[in-house]
């Protein structure tokens, strides 16, 4: 005879498996028409990772400084942006227009309301500092893709459980449920 606890766990497992099977198709990043066909959501300021991280070779952790010590990655403070763009005005009219938005936000003391791109369900914890410690700066690219080549950042990985587990298996780290679900 099955205990009540075992029955509940079995029901949850079967429900999760059914949901997973329903949404098991390959992830396709959305294409946003109002940003010239670029993938990903339109942000309040068109931040060019391909210029900052690619052309200018600014390391991820220069702007995302708290990622190595905090559980949440954190969006860079406007102070980080204005630190450079107080002096750097942009090389093209479109870049100058976006930098003007940064300067205006700084002057008005109103940081942009960025749209989150890489979101996990509320029941999943992804402590960035642990991943940075284990994988070094390669951890950024492994999950976020080659942002140095992205004019606009978009989600390249599914960030679904199977994708995460395969990385844990490959790197021979714990697959205990409580590592990510607590």
Go through each PLM region and give its residues.
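Sequence context surrounding c-type heme c attachment/ligation sites in exported
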Residues: 41-94, 124-182
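Bacterial N-terminal signal peptides
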Residues: 7-17
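Sterically constrained small-residue positions within well-ordered secondary structures
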Residues: 12, 36-38, 51, 72, ...
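Primarily the internal scaffold of c-type cytochrome electron-transfer domains
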Residues: 22-40, 88-124, 174-175, 179-182
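Positively charged n-region of N-terminal signal peptides that target proteins for export
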Residues: 1-7
């Amino acid at each position: 005879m099955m205990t009540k606890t075992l029955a509940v766990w079995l029901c949850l497992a079967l429900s999760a498996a059914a949901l997973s099977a329903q949404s098991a198709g390959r992830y396709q990043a959305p294409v946003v028409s109002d940003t010239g066909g670029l993938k990903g959501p339109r942000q309040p300021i068109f931040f060019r990772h391909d210029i900052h991280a690619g052309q200018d070779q600014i390391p991820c952790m220069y702007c995302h400084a708290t990622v190595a010590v905090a559980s949440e990655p954190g969006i860079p403070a406007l102070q980080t942006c204005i630190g450079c763009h107080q002096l750097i005005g942009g090389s093209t009219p479109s870049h100058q227009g976006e930098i003007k938005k940064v300067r205006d936000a700084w002057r008005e003391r109103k940081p942009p309301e960025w749209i989150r791109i890489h979101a996990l369900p509320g029941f999943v914890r992804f402590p960035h500092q642990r991943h940075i410690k284990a994988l070094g700066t390669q951890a950024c690219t492994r999950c976020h893709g080659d942002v140095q080549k992205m004019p606009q950042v978009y989600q390249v990985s599914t960030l679904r459980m199977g994708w995460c587990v395969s990385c844990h298996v490959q790197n021979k780290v714990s697959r205990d449920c409580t590592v990510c679900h607590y």
